[in-house]
Amino acid sequence: MLAPTLRAARPFGFRFKRILWVCIGLTTLFVFITSEVLLVADYPMYHAYRLQVIADRQLLIPHTLAGIFALFIGPINFSSRIRQRHFTLHRVLGRIYAVSVFVGSFTGIALAWGRPGLPGTSMQAAAWMVCTTAAVVTARNRQIDVHRQWMARSYAVTFTFVSSRVLNLVPAYWNHLGDVFSAVGVIAFTLASLLIVELGLNWHELTTHRR
């Protein structure tokens, strides 16, 4: 009786992962268009921020590149097919991901230095580095299941760089970016992302009664 149950569970898990990655991809595309494309096009509401971006470009360029590397390496390394068939590539990309996290974290803190958003950015960067470090350590210790869990947490923090920009076109939201409300928002997005991952990692235990 167990075999049919397991066979039924696998397609469900596969479909869920596919839907999840599609949603993540569509959200990323939406944010790219409504934030980055409009920023380059000098959208009126973004004009003051555009000037700030130009002024901060020396730190912002490595920060952005690091974030992009982490954002796109994550889904590749979560692929069990790539991990099994191209393990060397998986390890190389994992190292690039880890370096990107630390570069993104420190440049993010440097960009926020002396500004109201520093507490939120520092907390986000700390969570990002801690989760990624735990993922690296558990991988080196060959605790693969635990490694995957920490990578899920790390990528949840990575994705806050996208999720926190979904509402950018809403004036009431955009007008508070850069002030104390922004710092609270970054912390809230980070904690919410980690909470969602924890619920996902423990969903079976939360929904199944042990006999």
What residue ranges belong to the model's regions?
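Alpha-helical membrane insertion/targeting regions
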Residues: M1-R211
